[in-house]
Structures are given as structure tokens and as C-alpha cells.
Amino acid sequence: MKENKIRKNKEFRHVYRRGKSYSNRLLVLYICKNRCNINRLGVSVSKKVGKSVTRNRVKRLIKESYRLNLDKDMKQGYDLVFIARNSSNDKDYKDIESALINLLKKAGIYN
């Protein structure tokens, strides 16, 4: 799972510049093709969302939603960066999961 993460600032910038964006009321998704056979995930939560406890909770919810839906019919070979919006700070798991699946369907990589 370690190789499936986007960690470096340079990698995030590449996805922001070269990728296409999709958004809804809770999340923003930037997606860009990579040269691997796997999807790589990056999560970004601004300080506007709340204090560190809230930001980390939102990050955990996004990562867990992605992990549980990873084995379903999802196309491979993409870099995905999810950005949490301010309205996501008080949402529960089901809300985050439905927003995440909605964005993946908009991007055309989730069937």
C-alpha cells in the first residue's frame, strides 16, 4: 500500500497541473494518468476545514472509503488527489463515501 500513495509535493503539483478536476459539495478530485498499473491516492485537507483532529478524521474517512471501494470495478493507472472542502468537517462516513463514489463515476473510472 505504501507505493499506492502520493506523498511528494512535486507529485501533487504534477496532478494539479496536468490533471482534470471534478467536484461536488464535499470533495474535489484531481485525476491524471500515470505510467503504472496501479492507482495512487493523495489526500489534502486545508486548515480551513478545522483543527488537526477534524482534518485527520476527514483524511481517515476519505482513505477508508477509497480502500473499501478499491476492489470493485475501478480502472487502474491513475493518480488521484482528493481535496476536502470546508463542508466535509461534520459529515459521517456514508456522506464522504457517496461523495467519493460520485466523483469517481464522474471521472469515468468507477463502474
From Swiss-Prot:
Top EC category: hydrolase
Gene it is expressed from: rnpA
Keyword set includes Nuclease: yes
Self-association state and partner proteins as the record states: Consists of a catalytic RNA component (M1 or rnpB) and a protein subunit.
EC number: 3.1.26.5
Record's protein name: Ribonuclease P protein component
GO-annotated biological processes: tRNA 5'-leader removal
Cross-referenced InterPro entries: Ribosomal_Su5_D2-typ_SF, Ribsml_uS5_D2-typ_fold_subgr, RNase_P
NCBIfam families: rnpA
Species this protein is from: Clostridium botulinum (strain Loch Maree / Type A3)
Keywords of the record: Endonuclease, Hydrolase, Nuclease, RNA-binding, tRNA processing
A GO term for molecular function: ribonuclease P activity
Family classification: Belongs to the RnpA family.
Disulfide bonds: none
Reactions catalysed, as given in the entry: Endonucleolytic cleavage of RNA, removing 5'-extranucleotides from tRNA precursor
GO cellular component term, pick one: ribonuclease P complex
Gene3D superfamilies: 3.30.230.10
Role summary: RNaseP catalyzes the removal of the 5'-leader sequence from pre-tRNA to produce the mature 5'-terminus. It can also cleave other RNA substrates such as 4.5S RNA. The protein component plays an auxiliary but essential role in vivo by binding to the 5'-leader sequence and broadening the substrate specificity of the ribozyme.
Pfam families (alphabetical): Ribonuclease_P (PF00825)
